[in-house]
A protein has these predicted regions:
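Extreme N-terminal starter segment of soluble prokaryotic enzymes
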Residues: 1-3
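Low-complexity, flexible helical/coil segments
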Residues: 5, 38-41, 93-98, 109-116, ...
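A conserved beta-strand-loop-helix scaffold within acyl/acetyltransferase catalytic domains
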Residues: 5-51, 55-68, 117, 143-155, ...
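Active-site/acyl-donor-binding loops of N-acyltransferases
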Residues: 7-10, 33-34, 122-169, 288-289, ...
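Short amphipathic alpha-helical segments
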Residues: 71-77, 160, 191-193
């Protein structure tokens, strides 16, 4: 086998990717461009068999160690190849090892998009379910060592995710949701939640939502510079969009006014009936209905005053939720999401994600929606897990992270030094938050 550099032949690279079941946006040259605007460099490679046919695709990122001419090579969610063919896999990685050694790489890290064990979306492993242990054995036999298992967000990429197959039988994707979730989406629309695509000029709006979400959920948010870079590289190629949900208070006011008018009409009707009734039980029942309507009428009047105030403050509507979704072929990844704290029960996030699904289904032929990461740690991540679970997706566990040593000395040096550097970085970030 031999390596073929594909930076100037991207159509051929993508043509091979399209034939592979474990293809992913993170192994595209376009994703590599996003990362090379920072501290990484990039290679786009095909591994060719002796008959000159491609058997593997590898978009490899390189990160230089400080002070020395040595690099960590990383194939995000890659490489893309057949992991069931053990002998071919050994040859693929043997060829890559020779190539990477010449590039002064001391090790190769992979975390392929391969499903390992079967789970329910309630975070329970299915007894007797499928177990693609063959993948793991073949990777180890090809010269890799396995990194410690992490079922949270501490890996380079999330090991657990939730994926929803998208279906529309003519009535819309929302109609495939259960009754409770359909109700939430429909109420959001009635309450004035409007969804739309943003542009690069809207990046500061997303950044504000992002800061709110990061502070609330205690994580380090992606910077506006990184998100802008991602958008600038991928949007012209049709691979990312920025989406928003806002509250149109004109719609909300009309909804609240309609509820008040309906309640007032019912109140007037019942009070008129009360004068003609003789049956004590019937009178008592109508009086209870009237009292209940009085409470609702007062509530609706108060709500109308609140909405009028919101309308005066936000005449163009208030943005309450945003999301970045990347796409490749027939798959979408819900990469980043942000929202205000407490949207008054509007379910704007639910409405936004549902609208994104339908838009991508109709416009791009997307048939699989990856929520991109959940955690087994329900105590700290129950909120985000619960939101994603509510769509009734499949919980997917990927095979994990593996490292192939190329230079044993530098490989061991890196894995001794790197955890200490990450720990120091996290301490600095915590201090900055305080």
């Amino acid at each position: 086998m031999y390596i073929k550099e594909m930076s100037n032949a991207l159509e051929e690279y993508h043509a091979f990717m399209e034939t592979q079941a474990n293809r992913t946006v993170f192994q595209t040259p376009e994703w590599g461009e996003v990362k090379t605007d920072g501290s990484w460099t990039r290679d786009v490679l095909l591994v060719m068999a002796d008959n000159h046919e491609p058997v593997a695709a590898a978009m490899i990122l390189y990160r230089k160690l400080p002070g020395v001419n040595k690099y960590l090579a990383y194939a995000p969610r890659g490489i893309v190849t057949d992991y069931t063919n053990a002998e071919q896999l050994k040859s693929v990685f043997a060829a890559l090892k020779v190539y990477l050694k010449a590039k002064n790489a001391f090790g190769l890290k992979i975390d392929p998009e391969l499903q390992w064990r079967e789970w329910t979306n309630k975070f329970e492993m299915v007894e007797g379910g499928f177990n693609n242990e063959e993948y793991r054995k073949n990777i180890l036999a090809a010269g890799f060592v396995e990194r410690p298992m992490d079922l949270g967000f501490d890996g380079i990429q999330p090991r657990l995710t939730m994926i929803l197959p998208l279906k529309d039988e003519g009535k819309g994707i929302v109609e495939t949701f259960n009754k409770k979730e359909r109700y939430k989406v429909n109420v959001a629309k009635k309450q004035g939640v409007v969804c739309y695509k943003g542009t690069l000029e809207d990046m500061p709006i997303y950044d504000e939502l992002n800061k709110i979400t990061a502070e609330r959920d205690q994580y380090v948010a992606r910077s506006i510079e990184y998100l802008t870079t991602m958008y600038q590289h991928l949007h012209p190629k049709g691979m990312v969009d920025l989406y928003f949900a806002k509250v149109d208070y004109n719609v909300q006011l009309a909804f609240a006014t309609n509820r008040l008018e309906t309640a007032q009409k019912e109140y007037d009707k019942l009070t008129g009936q009360l004068e003609t009734l003789n049956n004590p039980k019937r009178i008592e029942n109508v009086q209870k209905q009237i009292e209940s309507l009085k409470v609702n009428i007062a509530k609706y009047e108060k709500e109308i005053e609140r909405v009028k105030g919101d309308l005066e403050q936000y005449p163009e509507g208030k943005v309450v939720s945003g999301a970045f979704v990347v796409t490749y072929l027939d798959k979408a990844y819900y990469l980043y999401g942000a929202n205000i704290t407490g949207d008054g029960g509007l379910n704007a996030n639910k409405a936004l994600v549902s609208w994104i699904m339908q838009t991508l289904y109709d416009e791009k032929g997307i048939r699989s929606f990856d929520f991109f990461g959940v955690s087994e740690d329900q105590e700290h991540h129950g909120g985000i897990n619960g939101f994603k679970q509510s769509f009734d997706p499949e919980l997917v566990e990927y095979i994990g992270e593996f490292d192939m040593p190329i230079s044993k000395f530098w490989f061991e040096m890196f894995h001794t030094w790197a955890p200490k550097a990450v720990s120091l970085k996290n301490k600095i970030l915590v201090r900055r938050k305080k």
